[in-house]
């Protein structure tokens, strides 16, 4: 039985690779990694590759392909897969993008939080939860950092979310920590990083930093900073 408070206290003293080692020892085949192939995704993907080399076991990497990612993200995913060779499990919504738009319209254009939450539930949260169930996941690691949003700043290294354990190996990392790790290990940057993006999601809800907004404040037209994957309750917690 995992004690959240005691485990989080133990994890606070560990660096990111050691947190992944702890999770593998604790959850075994129930451990998975989620990735968005965003600006900082290469860091945890590299750490999972290193874990595989130490343990001999491939941790499955779950990628929710919404069907609305920028072309650069799809190409970046191919580049990292070829470079690092992880066990990628790409999942999609049961409802196609065309069907969703026919039934609900272009949900991101209405300017309402309700439509944006419906979009995120259909395209992201439900496919991810289905993948967790299919793979028998009991704990998933993600690249959330405390400095990204107010909600994430209040997170602990390990918390229960929608009946599973959510591990945040990079919770205390800064943008500089991410950049220097990638430089140290020769990891390629996302193509949109050089165009001023500090975070990348779907093409219609991402924008480069413009001097007045930056980070996840550029996402979802400023209506919200979380897609729902990393949130407890009906909308879930996340990628």
Please place each PLM-identified region on the residue numbering.
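Nucleotide-activated chemistry modules centered on ATP-dependent adenylation/adenylyltransferase
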Residues: 1-239
């Amino acid at each position: 039985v995992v004690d959240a408070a005691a485990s989080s206290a133990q994890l606070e003293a560990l660096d990111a690779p050691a947190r992944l080692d702890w999770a593998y020892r604790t959850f075994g085949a129930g451990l998975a990694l989620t990735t968005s192939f965003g600006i900082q995704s290469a860091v945890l993907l590299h750490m999972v590759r290193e874990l595989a080399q130490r343990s001999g076991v491939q941790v499955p990497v779950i990628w929710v392909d919404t069907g609305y990612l920028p072309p650069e993200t799809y190409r970046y995913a191919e580049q990292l897969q070829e470079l690092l060779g992880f066990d990628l499990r790409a999942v999609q919504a049961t409802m196609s993008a065309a069907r969703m738009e026919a039934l609900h319209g272009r949900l991101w254009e209405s300017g309402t939080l309700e439509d944006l939450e419906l979009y995120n539930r259909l395209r992201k949260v439900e496919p991810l939860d289905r993948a967790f169930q299919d793979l028998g996941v009991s704990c998933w690691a993600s690249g959330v950092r405390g400095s990204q949003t107010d909600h994430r700043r209040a997170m602990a290294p390990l918390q229960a979310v929608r009946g599973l354990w959510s591990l945040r190996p990079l919770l205390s990392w800064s943008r500089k920590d991410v950049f220097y790790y990638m430089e140290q290990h020769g990891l390629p940057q996302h193509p949109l990083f050089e165009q001023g993006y500090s975070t990348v999601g779907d093409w219609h809800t991402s924008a480069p930093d413009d001097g007045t907004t930056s980070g996840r404040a550029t996402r979802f037209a400023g209506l919200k900073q979380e897609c729902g994957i990393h949130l407890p309750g009906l909308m879930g917690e996340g990628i």
